[in-house]
């Protein structure tokens, strides 16, 4: 796939639209955060106009605003603690269906929603598929304990930085009122072990490593011409 912006957008659109076609009438679905998911929302809007009945649980204020704009009815995990499926993007995905997520700073709600779903549909363009996870792992932290968390995160072999906002001074604030620490790892030999190690640090709310949902994950990889659907052996089609 050509690396142009138009080609990437076409790949994301193809993946998002294919995910939306997997939604069945009467489903309660999780709606992730990010540009690829917004294409799924766009497609769902058209299907709703054609008579599809569906309600969504958004993972961020941004997604909630987009869903309302496109006429998708919304609900909450309080009212629907079990979801039929969830659709979300990823920054990286490896052959074992382990993910790094979190550029949209919604990792805690995304992980809650994905964990509540019978099936987790991950939509990516082919550049997001990697042989091994590495690079930046976002971590959501309590502001009160961020400095102490930084020291312990360094002990796990990374270079952590508090994410700075782009259009305002100061750090990025999540929808939960917390900070995002971006942790740069040169390599991640054992993603599941690292996810557990990060989670054990006091003050950490959640990390962008998703390693415990591989059994119910389907990855839709988009490119300009077609989509590839990768299904975990543990998923029942």
UniProtKB/Swiss-Prot annotation:
This is Ribose-5-phosphate isomerase A. Its EC number is 5.3.1.6. Keywords: Isomerase. Catalyzes the reversible conversion of ribose-5-phosphate to ribulose 5-phosphate. Belongs to the ribose 5-phosphate isomerase family. Substrate binds at residues 33-36, 88-91, 101-104, 128. It holds the Pfam family Rib_5-P_isom_A. It catalyses: aldehydo-D-ribose 5-phosphate = D-ribulose 5-phosphate. The keyword Isomerase applies. One of its GO terms (biological process) is D-ribose metabolic process. Homodimer. GO terms for cellular component: cytosol. It comes from the Archaea. CDD domains: RPI_A. It is an enzyme of class 5 (isomerase). InterPro entries: NagB/RpiA_transferase-like, Ribose5P_isomerase_typA_subgr, Ribose5P_isomerase_type_A. Pathway: Carbohydrate degradation; pentose phosphate pathway; D-ribose 5-phosphate from D-ribulose 5-phosphate (non-oxidative stage): step 1/1. PANTHER family: RIBOSE-5-PHOSPHATE ISOMERASE (PTHR11934:SF0). GO terms for molecular function: ribose-5-phosphate isomerase activity. The gene is rpiA. It comes from Methanoregula boonei (strain DSM 21154 / JCM 14090 / 6A8). The active site is at residue 110.
């Amino acid at each position: 796939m050509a690396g142009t912006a138009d080609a990437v957008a076409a790949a994301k659109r193809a993946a998002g639209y294919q995910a939306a076609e997997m939604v069945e009438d009467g489903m309660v679905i999780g709606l992730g955060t990010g540009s690829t998911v917004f294409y799924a929302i766009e497609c769902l809007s058209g299907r709703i106009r054609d008579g599809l009945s569906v309600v969504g649980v958004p993972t961020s204020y941004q997604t909630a605003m987009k869903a309302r704009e496109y006429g998708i009815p919304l609900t909450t995990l309080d009212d629907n603690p079990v979801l039929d499926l969830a659709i979300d993007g990823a920054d990286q995905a490896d052959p074992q269906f382990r993910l790094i997520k979190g550029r949209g700073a919604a990792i805690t709600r995304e992980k809650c929603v994905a964990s509540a779903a019978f099936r987790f549909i991950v939509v990516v363009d082919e550049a997001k598929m990697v042989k091994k996870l590495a690079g930046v792992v976002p971590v959501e932290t309590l502001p009160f304990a961020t400095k102490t968390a930084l020291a312990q995160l360094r002990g796990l072999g990374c270079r952590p930085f508090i994410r700075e906002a782009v259009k305002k001074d100061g750090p990025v604030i999540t929808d939960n009122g917390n900070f995002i620490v971006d942790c740069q790892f040169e390599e991640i030999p054992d993603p599941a072990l690292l996810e557990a190690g990060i989670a054990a640090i006091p003050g950490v709310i959640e990390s962008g490593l998703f390693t415990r949902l591989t059994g119910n994950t389907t990855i839709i990889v988009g490119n300009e011409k077609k989509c590839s659907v990768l299904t975990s052996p543990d998923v029942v089609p």
